[in-house]
Amino acid sequence: EARDLGLGRLDGPRLLPYGNAGRGVYCGGMIQSNFSVVILAAGQGTRMRSDTHKVLHPIAGRPMLLHLLSTVEELGASRRIVVVGKGREQLEAALEGHGVETAFQAEQKGTGHAVQMARDALHGFSGPVLILYGDTPFVSGETLARMLERLAANDRPGVVVLASSPQDGKTYGRVILGEGDHISKMVEYKDANEAERAVKLCNSGMMAVDSADLFDWLAKVGNANAAGEYYLPDIVMIAKEEGRTPVVIEGEPFETSGVNSRA
């Protein structure tokens, strides 16, 4: 559900702080200018109880999806792809003129399947990919820059997951840490045992992944889980099995808050 984020009035700059980003990501003395973004927006958003597509509901007078697109545009993303499903006509009309490509997910088979729909749009691209959610518009440019910087580090983690520790973890998937920022395990709430559900660190779903590996790993994701869906976070364990060391970046809880009602 929509949360009181403690930000007071949600004006533009305060809603989406850009940090020191500018054109191309500047973070810690490093420039990362060649990256793409995939935004998942194919969910039906039935809890919004509205004919307007979920990600087009306004925040501070502007559709939430456009807030997120402004953030990644300010960072200098070379390609911006929005995965659409039901209500695609509304979305495509709203995105016209914003330099965004769309990919269509005809069936709702999970987040891993949704990202696979962006494969053709990313054809020929070599570089990091940020995977974001159209109904989670509060993530800051500074946090996204940190994710890209960590992905490019010398230890080549392969996957960087954005997590947070909200006061009420509700039914979020959990991130189990190993040494340092290394991820030992990720588990969806539906599939977690009691000890795993007690972990405070929650998966936001947002991540940064090298494009060279992304679709190979997605092809190995199965759907033998409680929901029968292809989970995007499963690529973390696949990366580990292939010798990579996926890591976590922790953001503020408000950055990972999804909007699920019109309140």
What would you call each of these model-derived segments?
Residues E1-L16:
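Extreme N-terminal basic, low-complexity initiation segments
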Residues N154-S165:
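A short, conserved acidic/glycine-rich loop-to-beta-strand motif
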Residues T143, S164-A195:
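Rossmann-like NAD(P)H-binding beta-loop-alpha module
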Residues T52, G76, E96-G99, E179, ...:
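Short, structured coil segments at secondary-structure junctions
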Residues S33-I59, L75, L95:
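Glycine-rich N-terminal loop/short-helix segment of MobA-like nucleotidyltransferase
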Residues Y18, Y26-S36, R62-E149, N154:
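Conserved N-terminal catalytic core of the sugar/cofactor nucleotidyltransferase
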Residues A41, V84, Y133, A163-S164:
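Short beta-strand/turn micro-motifs composed of small residues
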Residues H182-A263:
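Catalytic-core segments of class I nucleotidyltransferases/pyrophosphorylases
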